[in-house]
Amino acid sequence: MSKMKLDIGCGTKKFEGFTGLDKMRIPGVDIVHDLEVFPYPLDDESCEFIVGSHIIEHIKPWFTIEFFNELWRIMDWGGVLRLMYPEGGSFSFWQDPTHCNGFNATTFQYFDPEYPIYYVIYKPRPWKIMPGYPVQRATDIYEVRMTKEKKNATTT
């Protein structure tokens, strides 16, 4: 049985071949659920690929760790998380009044145990930043890809 490809916060522009999850009941949305309400209505390790285009900057900062931990829970081992986002503090970030959570190229080191100086602060579920990421896609738009890594003894 194949695993799900999930588009979180898909809105009306769901990626082709993906299951769309959004908090609004609109065309293209398959699962209506708020990304800040945990747990998501999905089984553990049910997704092989999760994409989020311009969604993480809308997650309230106090939900950030739990949000990434929940994506980790539903991600299958070796699955890929692809996120596109405006750089925190940039024009693209500040132009939308609903943007509340800024990310930059080093933010994701807090989720990867290979960067222990940052990872030990919050000890989230361990992700692995894929080689060559994050990358700049436009003037102030970035993309990061991470894979699910096994839980270690220091992860809570």
Task: Give the location of each predicted region.
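Conserved SAM-binding loop
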Residues: 3-89
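S-adenosyl-L-methionine-dependent methyltransferase catalytic module, highlighting the catalytic core
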Residues: 61-156
